[in-house]
Amino acid sequence: MARLALPGVGAYTARAVMAFAFELDAAVVDTNIARVYARHEGRRLTPREVQQLADTQVPSGDSWAWNQCLMDLGAVLCRPQSPGCAACPLAGTCAWRGAGADPAVGSAGVSRAQAPFEGSDRQARGRLLREL
């Protein structure tokens, strides 16, 4: 990933640019996607594990839609509190549904509190993406 050579651009930003700006096959793992994968697998996942799993599941030539759908699934149905399991398209294969303790808690960094936005790396990445 040559985009990683840019100062301040890490794996997530590089993958997001590849998938959303250039529509290249790249798995993007944000908080919502990490939660979906951890719950679906029914276990805690390290950041490396969730990225490797996501990399194996991106459909060739359709990563833009795939990543967007997973982000939306995590934001709208597979929410941190009160998930909408009854309406989830993955409910039939979800290892977590009704199994008890939520494996997403503490998994792949999905539970970390975020620092203030103003002056953050997130703000800088947003400015960089707008310029691309």
Model-identified regions with their sequence ranges:
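Catalytic cores of DNA base-excision repair glycosylases
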Residues: M1-Q123, E131
